[in-house]
Every structure is written in structure tokens, then in C-alpha cells.
């Protein structure tokens, strides 16, 4: 039975890879990669985002200057048409994956709910 779940998971992976949402996201990443300015903004923003996330996860204080820096980086990122498109497509793909996760977790949620009743 569990082997069947892995087979289905691999099929889901392939379905995600071939979906129009993923293909559009992939094309948007490639467009950013080819644009030196957009790519530089993108990598700077991602690096800053990762540093702040790491601080948050370790409980380190995030300074007001860092928050301001992140807000400025976000504003610059959103002003770039390619990056704005990329972020929109990332958000759409993230929502699809979140919906899929909710669907796959439904049996456990129902089990836990029935146990609590």
C-alpha cells in the first residue's frame, strides 16, 4: 500500500512539472536570469530574505534597519516588471501546492477530528 503512495507522489511530481502554472513560473525565472538588473535585484532580495528568515528561526533580533532594508528591497523588486511577474507566478504556484497539501492531509485531519469527538 505505501509503495502505491510513493508511485502516486511521483506521478503528482510529474503533473506539477508539466502543469502550465509551473511552466510559466519556470519561464519567468529564465527571463529574470537573462536580465542582469532583474537578476541582481532578485538575488539581493532573496539573500536578504534568507538572512532575516534565519534570524527569525534562531530567535535573533531583527533590527529596525533590517526591516527597512527589506521593505526597500521589496519595493525595488516590485517595480521591476519581470520580478513582479515572477512573484505573482510564485504566489500562484504556492497556492496550488498549499491546496494539494490540504487535500493530502485531509485523511489525517478527519482521523484526528474523529478521535477528539
Curated annotation (Swiss-Prot):
Transmembrane segments: none annotated. Pfam families: Com_YlbF. SUPFAM superfamilies: YheA/YmcA-like. It comes from the Bacteria. Belongs to the UPF0342 family. This is UPF0342 protein GWCH70_0629.
Amino acid at each position: 500500500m505505501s509503495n502505491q503512495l510513493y508511485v502516486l507522489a511521483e506521478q503528482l511530481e510529474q503533473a506539477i512539472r508539466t502543469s502550465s502554472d509551473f511552466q510559466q513560473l519556470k519561464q519567468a525565472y529564465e527571463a529574470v536570469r537573462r536580465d542582469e538588473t532583474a537578476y541582481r535585484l532578485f538575488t539581493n532580495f532573496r539573500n536578504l530574505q534568507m538572512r532575516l528568515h534565519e534570524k527569525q528561526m534562531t530567535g535573533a533580533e531583527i533590527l529596525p534597519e533590517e526591516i527597512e532594508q527589506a521593505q526597500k528591497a521589496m519595493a525595488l523588486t516590485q517595480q521591476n516588471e519581470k520580478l513582479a511577474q515572477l512573484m505573482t507566478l510564485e504566489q500562484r504556484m504556492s497556492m496550488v501546492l498549499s491546496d494539494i497539501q490540504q487535500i493530502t492531509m485531509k485523511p489525517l485531519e478527519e482521523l484526528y477530528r474523529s478521535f477528539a469527538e
